[in-house]
């Protein structure tokens, strides 16, 4: 096998080097790739297949490769230059937006080429040209410059043919692709058979690393930041040599005759000789079943009728099969990620009838359309992905390609996906309407208010504020409550009533006291008049009737005095029983009654003394003095026995004993260390006791009764207690000395 001439190769390399220097001077040079063998995969995305009329599937794998017995297909790989790596093999599907220069360079040279190319070399050339023309980042000016230089290079290289191209009898020329380029602007859209030739499987092994290049192609901004002139020149030089070989093979296809049905069945009989057995992947059947579709079915029909070539399906199927075998693995990685596009192409697995190429007038059309294509704005990786088709068989390979898909998905994420992956703390606001970074930036430039601006005060109003707002709203609407609000005046009324009743009760008590005082004065005056009448000698029955008719007269001591005198005038009477009855009725003052009873019981006393006593009973002072004199004159055996006590006890003034509530409380002296003689003495303290309590104290429990001894007078004290010495203790609450000397300390 003889390769292309050294002169053409050197000229192509020189032109390519000049182009790279020009791009470097303009600052538009592509960044170098650390893995140049992935460049072809990075440049060549897969276009979506065209819509077509579904037809019966045909197995054309038996008659697509003619004259396979003479020379094997793998011979051309033995003479491949060493600088061309395995990953530079063309892709299975051309890109959505190919470059104008490279596309025109490929097709413009077809007019001078001979149809003697090897059938397996034609799809390689076309697909690689599509792969090189995939780069969307080149500006239109650079692409036009490339187009001119590449057209010149094809002019010199078109005459050189590879000896290997004579092995097959007939192949379809490369000019069959312009019809497809008119619709999708793609240099390649050929159908492929349902079952590819097993001899062609050995070519796709080196494409395993090409997925990394496609991943890097999806992030063009990251690639552009790492530019190097030296590595790019070496990479492009290798690609240039490969393009030159593919162009020569493509031109040589025209001169070959069409194979017959008998010849097309030969390629299955002989396996490839030079391809290693380990280079064929295990999943080749699933991936090779994917077929690129033609875009325009009308062009297919017109070209078939125009040129009248019935065996077009057999001629076209072989290049499509070889091309698809080479690029099945990288294309499956792209199509697995974009399985959503399968709905657009439901008939993708059915065979298409290719268009018979026409070498003459279509070349200029391709050049013009390729220039128009190159002037379109550059697309991002997302736009390429949106047009890449996928089939169910491609999705079936997802489990076999997990390693490549994981790497591709990680690097294929754009800035928007990273933003969505790591949302801010307020991501719950954007769940219903997620925004990308671009839309957020655009909204901020337009002045759209953010969530924090629209709600600067996130605090809710308090209950009082809400109640006021509700009241204002109800007033504005004219609404009222169905029932009046609760009033608290009832409680205030109760308090006022309690206060008024308290003061009223006090007033009532005062009035009652005044009325009682007036009544007591009237009763007292009436009883005094009765006593006067008794002394005058009025009939006792009439006086008794008058005294009994007075209400509440039993509470006065004068009533009992009148009664006692009336009984005494009649004869003897029970003075003690009368006294007890007076005490039970609460007669006051009791001392006045005692004095009268004592006078009435004295047999030695004359009637005059009695009358004088009764006449002087009006004044308490005179009667008390007389009683004291009488008591002192009367002999008392107890006084003689207790002379020291009587001598020590002073005479109590009568004025201090007028208050009958004052009594003497006898209590033992607390124990004092070092003074044993004091323990025999007792303390006498004047206290005030109520007559009402004394009357009811017998009904009280033991705890409420008087614990100490309480006597009404000194005589009772001598009778109750036999202590020889008493000590008087002054009561601060009751400043009464009772005639005792108070030692000032």
Curated annotation (Swiss-Prot):
Pfam families: CKAP2_C. Microtubule-associated protein required for mitotic spindle formation and cell-cycle progression in neural progenitor cells. InterPro entries: CKAP2-like (IPR052855), CKAP2_C (IPR029197). Keywords: Cytoplasm, Cytoskeleton, Isopeptide bond, Phosphoprotein, Ubl conjugation. This is Cytoskeleton-associated protein 2-like. A motif (KEN box) lies at residues 183-185. Highly expressed in regions of active neurogenesis and neural stem/progenitor cells (NSPCs), both embryonic and adult, not detected in lung, liver, kidney, heart, and skeletal muscle. There is a cross-link at residue 195 (Glycyl lysine isopeptide (Lys-Gly) (interchain with G-Cter in SUMO1)). Its main location: cytoplasm. Ubiquitinated by the anaphase promoting complex/cyclosome (APC/C). It is found in: Cytoplasm, Cytoskeleton, Spindle pole. Residues 26-305, 319-362, 422-483, 608-638 are annotated as: Disordered. Transmembrane segments: none annotated. One of its GO terms (cellular component) is mitotic spindle. The gene is Ckap2l. Residues 192-202, 459-475 have a biased composition (Basic and acidic residues). The KEN box is required for the association with the APC/C-Cdh1 complex, ubiquitination and degradation. Residues 67-89, 101-136, 205-216, 224-233, 242-253, 284-301, 427-442, 608-624 have a biased composition (Polar residues). The keyword Metal-binding does not apply. Belongs to the CKAP2 family. There is a cross-link at residue 195 (Glycyl lysine isopeptide (Lys-Gly) (interchain with G-Cter in SUMO2)).
